[in-house]
Amino acid sequence: MANVNIKPLEDRVLVQISEAETTTASGLVIPDSAKEKPQEGVVVAAGPGRFDGDDRVPMDIKEGDTVVFSKYGGTELKYNGEEYLLLNARDVLAIIEK
């Protein structure tokens, strides 16, 4: 997992995007123009949660979780040559348990 100096605020998470498949199961190479945008990644940083009155709502998502996120959610970032996505917690659809 990457060590980044980006700290998400409130209920946001920073996700390192998984690599898109470059070949099919039968060995055909998929060109960049035909690749699907990945919707899976690993949480490398998570905010403390949003405020509800004077209290913070705890986050269900934590650093190290592998998550599935909304296809069009978040803000793409490049940091130290790596691609990340900054998402609101509501854009995370599921946590993949291993």
Curated annotation (Swiss-Prot):
Together with the chaperonin GroEL, plays an essential role in assisting protein folding. The GroEL-GroES system forms a nano-cage that allows encapsulation of the non-native substrate proteins and provides a physical environment optimized to promote and accelerate protein folding. GroES binds to the apical surface of the GroEL ring, thereby capping the opening of the GroEL channel. NCBIfam families: PRK00364.1-6, PRK00364.2-2, PRK00364.2-5. Heptamer of 7 subunits arranged in a ring. Interacts with the chaperonin GroEL. The keyword Ribonucleoprotein does not apply. The gene is groES. The keyword Cytoplasm applies. It is found in: Cytoplasm. Its main location: cytoplasm. Belongs to the GroES chaperonin family. This is Co-chaperonin GroES. Keywords: Chaperone, Cytoplasm.
